[in-house]
Amino acid sequence: MKPFWKTKNFQIRWKEPLGKPDCPYAFRYVLILFGYSIRIHVWIRSDDKRYLHDHAWNFRTFVLKGHYFNVSQNNDIIVREKVSFTAFRKADHRHYVEVPKQGCITLLFCSRPYRKWGFWVDGKQFKRPLKYFHKFGHPICSEQ
C-alpha cells in the first residue's frame, strides 16, 4: 500500500490492512519521522501463528484497549505472556501475537530500523516476508 503522505524524512500510512485483503488480521496507522515511527495497530484477530517472526526495530508497545498474548519460545518451551499494559521488545525477539475475540488496540514507539525482519521456519531458517508468503501462502482466515 502506498503511503498517504511521504517525503524524505516524513511519512504517513493510514489504515493499512495487514494480512489477506479479504480478511486482514489488523489495521495499521503509521507516522514515520526521520526513521523513527509511531504506530497504532487495531487488532481484529491473531497474526500468523505457523512460525515466529521478528522485527526490523526495537519497540515499546502500550495496550490502549483490551489485551493480547505474546507467544514466544524459550529453548523448546512455548511461552505465552499476557500483555495488558506495556512491553518492550528487541528487534530480534521472535514471537507471534495472539488476540482474543474482542480484539485489541496497541500504540507502538519504534526505533529506526537496523536489520531485516522475517519469519523463522522451524526456528532455524530465516525467510523474508515475501519469500515466506510465496512459499507458505497466507493462513486461512478462520485459522488466525
Regions found by a protein language model. Give the residues of each.
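A short, N-terminal "cap"/entry segment at the start of jelly-roll beta-barrel domains
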Residues: 1-37, 77
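Conserved short histidine dyad/triad with adjacent acidic residue
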Residues: 37-54, 90-92
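A short secondary-structure junction signal
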Residues: 41, 72-74, 98-99, 116-122
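Ligand-binding loop in jelly-roll beta-barrel domains
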Residues: 90-116
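Active-site or metal-binding loop neighborhoods of secreted/extracellular toxin and effector enzymes
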Residues: 117-144
